[in-house]
């Protein structure tokens, strides 16, 4: 168990040390009437390089063929296109307070079936080097399905089972440690009591012998 604890602590320390940008895929199933976050994370290859980034999101509704632009985010300004499907529903949830955007995620509030389809997060980044500038572009694609009720995926079920198993194992280990410590303390206490009793008997016996010797001398 000590080894397991050391591994957990080590993992936490390593993750804290890295502490950089990590690209994570977006969830792809939204529940009707709920708020849904569409992830778009695009990390720089070299964190020390200065950069400026902006994004444009496009959408192709399920059953249609063309992508249409729904928003642009640049210089901390969100520009929404006139589209009744997204009017009053899109909220910026990406990087703030910087022109070097790496998290370009958005929220869609009060999701409807009209939001089912394909999303594209276009990332345009300008990198500044000592003697030149370099433009890069990346497209993150997300397919979204809107459902009536959330369906738990296998990964979340397995994670929950593993969590409960770990709790049970830790509880059993803790109880075993407590029982072991209790028995050890009880044994030590009993040994100390026996030692004290032996010393008391020895002192009593010696006192009697001394008293007998005094009476004989008289």
Curated annotation (Swiss-Prot):
Sequence ranges on the Cytoplasmic membrane side: 180-218
Bridged cysteine pairs (disulfide): 21-43, 40-121
Topological type in the membrane: Single-pass type I membrane protein
Residues making up the signal peptide according to the UniProt record: 1-18
Top-rank lineage group of the source organism: Eukaryota
Chain segments annotated as transmembrane: 158-179
Glycan-bearing residues: 93, 110, 114, 135
Location of the protein in the cell: Cell membrane; Perikaryon; Cell projection; Cell projection, Axon
Ranges of residues in domain Ig-like C2-type: 22-150
Entry comment describing in which tissues the protein is expressed: Detected in brain (at protein level). Expressed in brain, heart, skeletal muscle and spinal cord.
Cross-referenced Pfam families: V-set
Main location: membrane
Gene3D superfamilies per the UniProt record, alphabetical: Immunoglobulins
Alphabetical keyword list: Cell membrane, Cell projection, Disulfide bond, Glycoprotein, Immunoglobulin domain, Ion transport, Membrane, Signal, Sodium, Sodium transport, Transmembrane, Transmembrane helix, Transport
Function text: Regulatory subunit of multiple voltage-gated sodium (Nav) channels directly mediating the depolarization of excitable membranes. Navs, also called VGSCs (voltage-gated sodium channels) or VDSCs (voltage-dependent sodium channels), operate by switching between closed and open conformations depending on the voltage difference across the membrane. In the open conformation they allow Na(+) ions to selectively pass through the pore, along their electrochemical gradient.
Family, per entry: Belongs to the sodium channel auxiliary subunit SCN1B (TC 8.A.17) family.
Name the UniProt record assigns to this protein: Sodium channel regulatory subunit beta-1
